[in-house]
UniProtKB/Swiss-Prot annotation:
SMART domains: HATPase_c, TOP2c
Protein name: DNA gyrase subunit B
Main EC class the enzyme belongs to: isomerase
Gene Ontology BP annotations: DNA topological change; DNA-templated DNA replication
Residues noted as binding Mg(2+) 1 in the record, renumbered to the chain: E429, D502
InterPro entries named among the record's database cross-references: DNA_gyrase_B_C, GyrB, HATPase_C_sf, Ribosomal_Su5_D2-typ_SF, Ribsml_uS5_D2-typ_fold_subgr, Topo_IIA, Topo_IIA-like_dom_sf, Topo_IIA_B
Domain Toprim, residue spans: 423-537
Cited HAMAP family: GyrB
Sites marked Interaction with DNA: K454, N457
Subcellular location: Cytoplasm
GO molecular function: ATP binding; DNA binding; DNA negative supercoiling activity; metal ion binding
Record organism: Spiroplasma citri
Quaternary assembly: Heterotetramer, composed of two GyrA and two GyrB chains. In the heterotetramer, GyrA contains the active site tyrosine that forms a transient covalent intermediate with DNA, while GyrB binds cofactors and catalyzes ATP hydrolysis.
Binding positions for Mg(2+) 2 per the UniProt entry: D502, D504
Length: 640
């Protein structure tokens, strides 16, 4: 540093070096999420071939050496010399940022992904990458290593009657220091969604990493979004109508839409543009809402209430959406998104197009299916009545939220600071543990809210019951930010909301109930990274004058082996509840920011999160049993 600021101080990062220097700019992070982003980039390139109707099969292989292979039966990346770079087009695509067919409207009318950065970014962040191209009855191979350096130039290696591209890459552990291990379930969830969104597409996933068994899944849904709605509704409740499905095209914009009601109380709405999940909605969702409200009210006025005077709409969107499951997917040649994350669609013309296509389809569906229409109107009418009854409870809740700290819940032991950026709220299971937490905390920035027993299961409860529940009201009031559409993170009183429960079955159940509530009513808390799970120790190990707190069975076994080697005697205490620790121990092990372990709660796949919420917390028992059977093997600590 100092005064040596001259021309030599200015770095020019060339080629793929810039990507390796700042990987977060291209894949978000270098954790497990960023690692899997590499897979999505290569898969997205194959999906672009599917969208262009040149491919219908994709195969993903998790190899023994922890590399991954993506195979498609598309046209194959061009191998001719590129007129601008003077090297093969294949080399250009994998070594130059923003090089790709996505920028040429003649090559891809519609595409997803990061618009041409994918292949080069994956290459830059890989220890090794091999690409095989099959086209023109020939097979070509090119290899790279050490972050995109050419290992083997492009060469012809044989003949073939097939077409397509195969990419194998091994992530660089120098970049991905946290992990380079791909998750089978993460990839499985994503490809299942892609198959739903691309009618007729077949994707298989093969795991070769286990010595004794090969794990394989294959997905193909010929009804696309219709199957998607059915899959999602399977675990929620009893369907009230056959799936309403419509597809259409207007001004080169393709619209697919599916809707089904169930007897549950929460809505599930997922929207996509060019296979990208638009979590924050946008103009396609606005168009769908406009059409649904219009056509439901038109049907009610013209078919059910036609003898009564008055032409005003009876139902609002809030009345109509209860118990509704919707999937809307559009394909747009020039999508415009808000920000860099592609989470909200902005194209203004989409609203009218979606409204027209969905509106015409829904109008016909209601007229042609009077029994289904009757059930839908009855469901909406009940929702309207419940809304009126719940309004008073909701207003009480809202009034509580805007009150100052003197009106906060009586059992809340608030912190001294009013600075939300450093304040923490511990939601603690039980009064005894709450007492220890109150005594052991740092009063300056840590608040304690004890819960009496299990909170209400919001997945099954009617809205009126939710707003009347004391425990839920205490949480809403303490946080001060409101719920659902009225949620305002600027009013949030604590930066960290930490769930602290016992390490047993009841504690796990309370955590699930709380997470379900936050996901359904304060989703922004999870999406913004405000929710954490405390990790109290499972064991206290004493030997001589030394005490060590142990947080997992695996850690305990390793420590026991270490003590045995040193010929030391020891005693082990198993903590079954937070109340077994005195305030000093609770602070030292679970609450001290310098020593505690917190798990941040995040949602990578909203569709899968909804399925799990519905399976674990919904009315149907069988899906819950199935989930437990399939996931029991992953449980590390169980106290029954």
């Amino acid at each position: 540093m100092g005064d040596n600021y001259n021309s030599e101080s200015i770095q020019i990062l060339e080629g793929l070096e810039a990507i390796r220097k700042r990987p977060g700019m291209y894949i978000g992070a270098t954790n497990a999420r960023g690692l899997h982003h590499l897979v999505w980039e290569i898969v997205d390139n194959s999906i672009d071939e599917v969208l262009a109707n040149f491919a219908n099969k994709i195969k993903i292989i998790l190899n023994k050496d922890e590399s991954i292979t993506v195979i498609d039966n598309g046209r194959g990346i061009p191998i001719e010399i590129h007129p601008k770079t003077k090297v093969s087009t294949l080399e250009t695509v994998f070594t130059i940022l923003h090089a790709g067919g996505k920028f040429d409207s003649n090559t891809y009318k519609i595409s997803g992904g990061l618009h041409g950065v994918g292949a080069s970014v994956v290459n830059a962040l890989s220890k090794y990458l091999k690409v095989e191209v099959r086209k023109n009855n020939k097979k070509y191979v090119m290899e790279f290593h050490n972050g995109g350096q050419i290992l083997t130039p492009i060469k012809e290696v044989g003949s073939t009657s097939e077409t397509g591209t195969t990419v194998t890459f091994l992530p660089d552990e120098k970049i991905f220091k946290e992990t380079t291990i791909f998750s089978f379930s993460t990839i499985q969830n994503r490809i299942k969604q892609l198959v739903f969104l691309n009618k007729g597409l077949e994707i298989s996933l093969v795991d070769l990493r286990e010595e004794d068994e090969e794990k394989t899944v294959l997905y193909q849904f010929n009804n696309g979004i219709k199957d998607y709605v059915l899959e999602l509704n399977k675990t929620i409740g009893t369907p009230l109508n056959d799936v309403f499905y419509v597809e259409g095209i207007e001004d080169n914009i393709v619209v697919e839409f599916g809707l089904q009601y169930n007897d549950n109380y929460s809505e599930n709405i997922f929207s996509f543009c060019n296979n990208i999940n638009t979590h924050e909605g946008g103009t396609h969702e606005e168009g769908a809402r406009l059409a649904i409200v219009r056509e439901i009210n038109n049907y009610f006025k013209n078919q059910i209430n036609k003898n009564n005077k008055g032409n005003e709409d009876k139902f609002t969107w809030d009345d109509i959406k209860e118990g509704m499951t919707i999937i809307i997917s559009i394909r747009h040649p020039e999508p415009q998104y808000e920000g860099q994350t592609n989470q909200k669609l902005l194209n203004s013309e989409v609203k009218k197009i979606v409204s027209n296509i969905v509106g015409k389809g829904l109008s016909s569906y209601l007229l042609e299916n009077p029994e289904d229409a009757k059930k839908i109107i009855e469901k909406i009418s009940l929702s309207l009545k419940a809304t009126i009854v719940a309004q008073r409870a909701k207003e009480i809740t809202r009034r509580k939220i805007v009150m100052d700290s003197f009106s906060l819940p009586g059992k809340l032991s608030d912190c001294e600071t009013k600075d939300a950026k450093i304040a923490e709220l511990y939601i603690v299971e039980g009064d005894s543990a709450g007492g220890s937490a109150k005594s052991g905390r740092n009063r300056k920035f840590q608040a304690i809210l004890p819960l009496r027993g299990k909170i209400l299961n919001v997945e099954k409860a009617k809205q009126i019951k939710i707003f009347e529940n004391n425990e839920i009201n205490s949480i809403i009031t303490a946080l001060g930010a409101g719920i659902k559409d009225n949620f305002n993170d600027k009013k949030l009183r604590y930066q960290k909301v930490i769930i602290m429960t016992d390490a047993d079955v009841d504690g796990a159940h309370i955590r699930i109930l709380l997470l379900t509530f936050f996901y359904r009513y304060m989703k922004d808390l999870i999406e913004n990274g405000n929710i954490y799970i405390a990790q109290p120790p499972l064991y206290k190990v004493e030997n001589s004058n030394q005490i060590r707190y142990v947080y997992s069975d695996n850690e305990l076994e390793l420590y026991k082996e270490e003590l045995l080697k040193q010929n030391k005697n020891y005693t082990i205490q198993r903590y079954k509840g937070l109340g077994e620790m005195n305030p000093e121990q609770l602070w030292e092990t679970t609450m001290d920011p310098e020593r505690r372990l917190l798990l941040k709660v995040s949602v990578n796949n909203a569709f899968e999160a909804n399925l799990i919420c519905n399976e674990l917390m919904g009315e149907n028992v069988e899906p819950r049993k199935k989930f437990i059977r399939e996931n029991a093997k992953y449980v590390k600590n169980l106290d029954v």
